[in-house]
Amino acid sequence: MFNLIRKSTEWGGKTLVLESGKIARQANGAVVVTYGGTTVLSTVVAGKAKEPVDFLPLTVQFVAKSYAVGKIPGGFLKREGKPSDRETLISRLIDRSIRPLFPSGFYDEVSIVCNLLSYDTVTPPEVTALIGATAALAISGVPFNGMVVGARVGYLLSEDKYLLNASADEMLSSSLDLFLSGNKDSVLMVESEASELSESQMLAAISFGHQNCQEVIKLIEEFREESGILPFGFIPHDITSLVDDIASSYTESFSIAYSNIVKKERVLELEKLRDQVLSDMLAKYEQPNGNLQCQYSSQDIISALKSFERSLVRSKIIETSSRIDGRAFNGIRDIEIEIDVLPKTHGSALFTRGNTQALVVTALGTPQDEQIVDDLDGDRRENFLLHYNFPPYAVGESAALRAPGRREIGHGKLAWKAIRYVLPEKSDFPYTIRVVSEITESDGSSSMATVCGASLALMDTGVPIKAPVAGIAMGLIKEGEKFIILSDILGDEDHLGDMDFKVAGTSSGITALQMDMKISGISIEVIEKSLLQAKDGRMHILDKMNLVIQESRECIKNHAPRIESIFINKDKIRNVIGSGGKNIREICEKTGARVEIMQDGTVMIYAINNDAVEYAKNMIMDIVSEPEIGKVFDGTVIEIVKFGAFVSFLGGKRGLIHISEIKNEHINAVGSVISVNDKVKVLVIGIDREYVQLSMRRVDQETGEPIDGELYNIRKTNSDSDDSFLSSGSVNNRHGSEKKRRGSGRSRRSSGGSSYHRDDLHNNGFGNGNRSFNDNRNGNEVPRKPRFF
């Protein structure tokens, strides 16, 4: 029933298995690839284009459903919705890897679906999916020039060791996360994020990955041979004579149009010429009865015109050593930079390079604003977001605004990778950071303008980044063995060239690298020269940026939110929260701040200004702090009794001010001096297992400063005497006669003096003429051990 084909090999320490003939047999090609514990079903279906087109209508979809990791989708429907960003990015990786290998002129619809069936959270699914897509194309009969395989490369800087298809845990210690694809002879695509690595380290990583792809390329070739399926015959439509016809009549006109350095004017001139060529060619080949004289259709004319323009611009660059806008091959367009361009945002920058412009804006939020990502590797939180928007007006088009597409998601992710390494640690800067790049003009390299603008906007915001980051896009014109590398390419140079090579980094090294090809790959030599030329361009751009701002502002804007983190003992978390959340609600209501408490004892305080942050922080510290002898605290009188007053301090702790510690003079009634709800400043003068003894008379009630002459070295004692209310606080354990203490104490109080003798101190902890509570000197009935709570 099944005609099984199976091939396997050991690769990167795991078993790689290709199998076909059992699942999805209605597709042109279907292969189940198992690599380690990850399984992907890749299918290819081809059909005639539904309408005439002059491009390859290739669609690639990577689908990762939650059952692959044994999960049920969240949400009400319990079913997967639109593709996640990760699915979109992997789809782009596969598309960019295989698109250059289809023959020129092949315009049939091709649909590739890579369905992740099982995922072990160790083996990279993008590697498995690309292998499956290539193997499925190889046995589908669709014309396809060569085998392409992808590999994920890591780098352990401390060991100078490169890793092949490492797990997510292993990549945590890696200074590089690079995915590349290549065929037998060359590299086709690179996507990477790095920690300021040098050009030589990046080149070695690319070479390492390409070499390790060869074993799998050989396996896929053997797999195709065993299947016995060959590509169906494809003969591209010959439009050579039509191209020559256009060239003979319009070379000079197009040369003049392409020499216009103003993009808007150049585009208008080229559009007029293209309309004229189409009209002239249709009229030339049309017969009186309306039928075409030969096989040339309007689509043929459009294809021929594109071929002519590509050849014209490329030959001009190579033969005359002159680019479209007259720059040298390594020349950078004029750069204009402004920061703080929007008054009420947390940070902003306007970066203009030639006719490419990015308005980049930052917004700071709290950790509660972090994006929760439901990923196959497990839920995670992102505190750095970068969104790239490319509206139609950026290229002078009239169209409706739509949701971000694959290109916008991909460009935003590249800029995100370029910036992420230089961001501060969350413990040092706990804000959630959102960067939005609005492309307001575009003539090539808008993603790299986003990188430059994001770096500038972050510094304007006051985010303490490690170093400024700049990006540059390189191009390639290759004819035979001759090639020219172009710095800071225009949109037309990107469209008509052979390579889009983007490099971003600091003055110390590369933080992101992306390469896309329009031909069947390039050699390591070309990549090396591109990296070195890109470094010169990156340094030039960084110099321009440094003229405007070299480092982050010392503080964030006044209208930006304030965040402060403090650490408390985990055992105190319940005290801060309070019964039913009472304490935390009270803090938020009184201060206007938001408070978030982590399980490790980290407390995050968010507010609109510093005063609110300090107020909330003080309230929290009051709750978690323990009374300390000799420290002054703010308190509130909560109860008046005959022998003193009870005071709430340190976030709800209760202490007692004995009547003799209220004022430095005799008082008949506590209520005549203080009342309930009075705010007082108190000094802790004694602590034992049951009581906290406080004093008002030893503290200046205006300034909160201890009064000179009223302090002494209080130390805790272990007196077991029932005649003393306190069991700590005295510096002298001598117990003089009651008569002596009473007499000396009265004389001092009546005279208001502040000079004392050590022998006058009783071990009750109040000192300075204070008597034992049981003296009942003021006529108050005081129990030996008053109830305290």
Curated annotation (Swiss-Prot):
Where located? Cytoplasm
* CDD domains associated with the record: KH-I_PNPase (cd02393), RNase_PH_PNPase_2 (cd11364)
Q: Where is the composition biased (Low complexity)?
A: 763-780
Q: Recorded E.C. number(s)?
A: 2.7.7.8
**Keywords, comma-separated and alphabetical:** Cytoplasm, Magnesium, Metal-binding, Nucleotidyltransferase, RNA-binding, Transferase
Q: Which domain of life is it from?
A: Bacteria
Pfam families according to UniProt: KH_1, PNPase, RNase_PH, RNase_PH_C, S1
- Give the top-level enzyme category: transferase
Annotated Mg(2+) binding sites: D494, D500
Catalytic activity, per the record? RNA(n+1) + phosphate = RNA(n) + a ribonucleoside 5'-diphosphate
- Listed GO cellular component terms? cytosol
Region annotation (Disordered) ranges: 709-789
Which PROSITE patterns does its entry note?
A: KH_TYPE_1 (PS50084), S1 (PS50126)
User: Where is each KH domain found?
Assistant: 561-620
Gene Ontology biological-process entries: mRNA catabolic process; RNA processing
Q: Which cofactor does it need?
A: Mg(2+)
The segment(s) forming the S1 motif domain are 630-697
- NCBIfam families for the chain: polynuc_phos, PRK11824.1
Query: What family is reported?
Result: Belongs to the polyribonucleotide nucleotidyltransferase family.
Per the entry, what this protein does is: Involved in mRNA degradation. Catalyzes the phosphorolysis of single-stranded polyribonucleotides processively in the 3'- to 5'-direction.
**Which protein are we looking at?**
Polyribonucleotide nucleotidyltransferase
Species of origin reads: Ehrlichia ruminantium (strain Gardel)
Gene coding for it: pnp
